Regions:
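Conserved catalytic core of the tyrosine transesterase superfamily
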Residues: 1-319
Length: 319
């Protein structure tokens, strides 16, 4: 997408900030959308000098009526980063506090071994009259979600140029935290991607997405969610609804739990396993990985028994 035009007193600084973020390896897309909203906000408030008061900050940070929690989190915290940038340049701006998610009792669905087997049997035998390419795409796409723990948007954002077939490495650009990262494929996934490339890559250019719709466009998450529901039904895995899943995103949770368990079982210390998992998942800090450790310990009590004290030492509090 092209960069929007900024018109507030912050316009030049916003453009310089976006250039700086891109040079640092971040994706411009989500920053530019939020900063365009911020630019419009500042224009409407009549801010005519590069300053940002506490009153301005309070107005910006207020949660909107129809705003999702995740959108509110991104809107406030990304503008806070921009304000920190201005502060370092010597401008008089009020620095907002971070917005945090409220604690929740929600528990993601961790797929059992039997559910995983049934699910992928249904995926591998899926047939579509609407788009025959789906029969080729879906076994690869869904296995990336489970075997690599990628988010759906990250997966649909993979382009041909992002795939290193020789070394089995995929670069993820459209990430939640707007910072590129790499995922390393195991031998099975590497072979699967190579077979997929043999069937499809000759049809697309380097800048094209590897998962295209029948219209030749980037696939939409909504369609993949609908297929996921159909696969659950065929695999006889009950769908609870109302956000209780099993959701597409629960494949990421399942990957994280299984990966942490595998590392622990192989003798890797928790102090070593945590940063490995955190980096692979694209988390900013190991604290974002805490929920997966809790999930693993609740599902496998022997791990809790072995590491409960270390968990307390790292995160504080108790299980």
């Amino acid at each position: 997408m092209s960069r929007p035009a900024f018109h507030s007193v912050f316009a030049d600084e916003i453009n310089q900030y976006l250039d700086y973020k891109i040079a640092s390896g971040f994706s411009e897309k989500s920053f530019s959308i939020i900063l365009k909203s911020f630019d419009d906000f500042c224009s409407k408030r009549g801010i005519d000098s590069i300053s940002f008061t506490r009153s301005d900050a309070d107005a910006w940070a207020e949660k909107r009526k129809t705003e999702a929690t995740t959108s509110h989190y991104a809107r406030v915290n990304k503008v806070k980063k921009f304000l920190e940038y201005l502060n370092l340049k010597g401008y008089n701006v009020y620095l907002m506090h971070d917005v945090f998610f409220k604690a929740t009792d929600f528990q993601p669905h961790i797929y059992t071994d039997d559910e995983i087997l049934r699910y992928f049997q249904a995926v591998d035998t899926y047939h579509s009259e609407r788009n025959r390419m789906e029969e080729v795409q879906l076994p690869v796409l869904f296995r990336l979600l489970y075997c690599c723990g990628t988010r759906i948007n990250e997966t649909l954002g993979i382009k041909k140029s992002d795939v290193d077939l020789e070394n089995g490495i995929i670069k993820l650009i459209e990430t939640k935290n707007d910072c590129e990262r790499y995922i390393v494929l195991n031998d099975g996934m590497k072979h699967l991607i190579q077979r997929y490339a043999d069937k499809t890559f000759y049809l697309i250019g380097d800048s094209d997405y590897i998962f295209l719709s029948h219209a030749g466009e980037r696939r939409r998450g909504r369609r993949i969610y609908d297929i996921h529901r159909m696969i659950l039904k065929r695999a006889e895995i009950p769908f609870l609804g109302d956000g209780n899943g099993p959701r597409l995103h629960d494949w990421r949770h399942t990957f994280a739990v299984h990966s942490f368990k595998q590392m622990v079982d192989s003798g890797i210390d928790m102090y070593v396993a945590l940063p490995i998992l955190s980096t692979y998942l694209g988390h900013k800090t190991i604290y974002a990985t805490e929920r997966y450790v809790r999930l693993t310990m609740s599902l496998y009590p022997y791990i809790e028994k072995r590491f409960s004290q270390r968990f307390t030492d790292i995160f504080g509090g108790s299980l």
